[in-house]
């Protein structure tokens, strides 16, 4: 199959493209591989996984801030259960190579959580964690 045909399948039927690319990899049929799009998709997978973990961390911080500062005891149990779920999902999805980037981005993640809480509650929250 020509590279143009492979690219067309990528653009029009992504699912079919994944099936064909996986088959070409299994068969080590390297001339049938759409290297450019494979590289982009692998990079996108990494970004997506990182984004999911960062989002879960932000939600956990958001709920911790609500528990500590919103003074809504009737909501605490729900918020705590949500935090447990976020933490379990983080643990499941976190890979060692994400940790340095999360540490680098932590201040921004924290600020996003603060912004979400302040959109709902009029509170004095710490500007840094």
How should these model regions be labeled?
Residues 1-58, 64-129:
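Surface/interface-facing alpha-helical segments and adjacent flexible terminal/loop regions used
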């Amino acid at each position: 199959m020509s590279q143009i045909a492979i690219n067309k399948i990528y653009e029009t039927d992504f699912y079919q493209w994944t099936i064909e690319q996986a088959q070409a990899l299994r068969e080590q049929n390297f001339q049938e591989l759409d290297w450019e799009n494979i590289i982009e998709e692998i990079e996108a997978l990494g970004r997506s996984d990182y984004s999911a973990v960062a989002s879960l961390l932000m939600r956990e911080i958001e709920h911790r801030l609500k528990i500590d500062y919103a003074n809504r005891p009737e909501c605490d149990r729900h918020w705590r259960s949500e935090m447990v779920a976020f933490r379990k999902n983080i643990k499941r999805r976190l890979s060692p190579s994400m940790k340095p980037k999360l540490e680098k981005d932590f201040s921004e993640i924290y600020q996003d959580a603060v912004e979400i809480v302040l959109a709902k509650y009029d509170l004095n929250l710490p500007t840094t964690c």
